[in-house]
């Protein structure tokens, strides 16, 4: 690359940085279609918007297309047609490598994403790939470990960690490279109840404290309760978009799409039908308080 080409490249990156930092909209899908073959369309005319610093759950039955959304967003798959924008910038082959720096992803199986010998090595891996100077690495690793509650696990090897702890290491590895968007692709599905609850709380903290945009692709209705927005997928199409309260208000509609409502809401409905004076709620503590007052 010549000196002039390098200056032009740096200017382009600087311009993209400004657009990203100034944008209040994190992600836009506009009429996106995707198919592995002509016979079967996986995504059909998918359109939605996710704001910066928003926690969004994408739900749907198996085969609904929800996981394909993360793959086309990260450039692992190329849409057949339509536009995908990240912070106002249309994703293309020319800028994909740069834009990927602003997206982190945590997968379903924690064992498949542990690449280092120890937790500390695993977090350092992404930093080494980005040529972060060794003298700056420790502070970044420590900050990511503190944010995910694994500062006491940094010297532990993979075999010494539980599934939930490995997922926290994976999240710390993502946080260390400081993306603006973090995608959780069925990240709680292989965890025990304790690990699931801890990860759900961490997602909320990443939105509230770290100011990240969180996208969780999930079939766990208990997780959806804490989201700002829910996108419901079925047969490759967006069926509904709304708050958790709006989405769960129509149980019959969800059941037709092979989805359920959270246990707390289900219990509140049952108690209300049995005569208790209880308003329907998605909040456990609120339900307990109302039961105690009856």
UniProtKB/Swiss-Prot annotation:
ABC transporter domain boundaries: 27-260
InterPro entries in alphabetical order: AAA+_ATPase, ABC_transporter-like_ATP-bd, ABC_transporter-like_CS, ABC_transpr_CbiO/EcfA_su, ECF_ABC_transporter_ATP-bd, EcfA_1, P-loop_NTPase
Bilayer topology: Peripheral membrane protein
Database matches in SMART domains: AAA
Keyword Membrane included in the entry's annotation: yes
One function term, GO molecular function aspect: ATP hydrolysis activity
One of the record's GO cellular component terms: ATP-binding cassette (ABC) transporter complex
PROSITE patterns: ABC_TRANSPORTER_1, ABC_TRANSPORTER_2, CBIO
Keywords of this entry: ATP-binding, Cell membrane, Membrane, Nucleotide-binding, Translocase, Transport
Cited Gene3D superfamilies: P-loop containing nucleotide triphosphate hydrolases
Stated family: Belongs to the ABC transporter superfamily. Energy-coupling factor EcfA family.
Known function: ATP-binding (A) component of a common energy-coupling factor (ECF) ABC-transporter complex. Unlike classic ABC transporters this ECF transporter provides the energy necessary to transport a number of different substrates.
Record's protein name: Energy-coupling factor transporter ATP-binding protein EcfA1
Annotated source species: Ureaplasma parvum serovar 3 (strain ATCC 700970)
Gene this chain is encoded by: ecfA1
